[in-house]
Amino acid sequence: MLVPWAPIAATSVVAAAASSYYFSNMAISNDAKTATLKGDDQWVDLKLKSSKDLSHNTKALIFELPTPDSTLGLTTASALLTKYVTPKGSNVVRPYTPVSDPDSKGEFELVVKSYPEGKMSKHIHELKEGDTLSFKGPIIKYQWQPNLHKEITLIGAGTGITPLYQLISAINKNPEDKTKVNLFYGNATEGDILLKDEIDAIAKAKPQQFNVHYFLDKPSDNWKGENGFISEEFIKGNSPAADSDNVKVFVCGPPPFYKAISGAKVSPTDQGEVDGALKNLGFNKDQVFKF
């Protein structure tokens, strides 16, 4: 089975409908006193400190927290909501996953890809230094526990790398966490690969623990990674089988990617049935998590 790349899109309707679930399942940081987002359903306006282009349509943005000692208030594998009000008075709400360390103080980082029809992503890309954006959260996604799984597989595409990178970063940061990680990450071109320097540095420092494969749909002549889409055969040959002990697979990407790899989520509270490549390989609902 071949897996297509496509833009990740989230609608304000979905974000709003999920709000009651999200905020009844909060991931509060260990130090609640310094947390900026406290899980109380209150929007907090934060100022853009700086931004830089990562590619022709992707930016890294640093937002200031209220004080130099403030933390954002998220834990590993959690996210937040962003909001802005249009000139006509409509609320636009979208979820994003920060890529900075949850324990970072004074600021945090988002990586945002702009899509032609993406109201929030276009708005964020137009922000200037000193402009503010409203945030709320945190949103729990998955409660990571070190060493719960001997080995995990992360399968992502496009900006779907952000929650997967959170897991990679947390495992790398914790010397007691010996979880082995396989990352299969697909994009259209080399310029679309996000966080590559950070991921490569981790894999180079701990090659026995972090196994990374990049896939390009449109590789250049000198590309040394994998060509084409993430195939069922590649997953089978480069990660633990479904009958392995305590196996876990994490998936994040656009809707066509979910459909091909794992099957779609039904709602924020319902992971849906496992379908696609992972179903064909024998994985069940307990073994697969869809961000």
Swiss-Prot record:
InterPro entries for the chain: CBR-like, Cbr1-like_FAD-bd_dom, FAD-bd_FR_type, Flavoprot_Pyr_Nucl_cyt_Rdtase, FNR_nucleotide-bd, OxRdtase_FAD/NAD-bd, Riboflavin_synthase-like_b-brl
Swiss-Prot/TrEMBL cofactor(s): FAD
GO cellular component terms, A-Z: mitochondrial intermembrane space; mitochondrial outer membrane
Main localization (coarse): mitochondrion
Enzyme class: oxidoreductase
One Pfam family hit: NAD_binding_1
Name the UniProt record assigns to this protein: NADH-cytochrome b5 reductase 2
Origin organism lineage: Eukaryota, Fungi, Dikarya, Ascomycota, Saccharomycotina
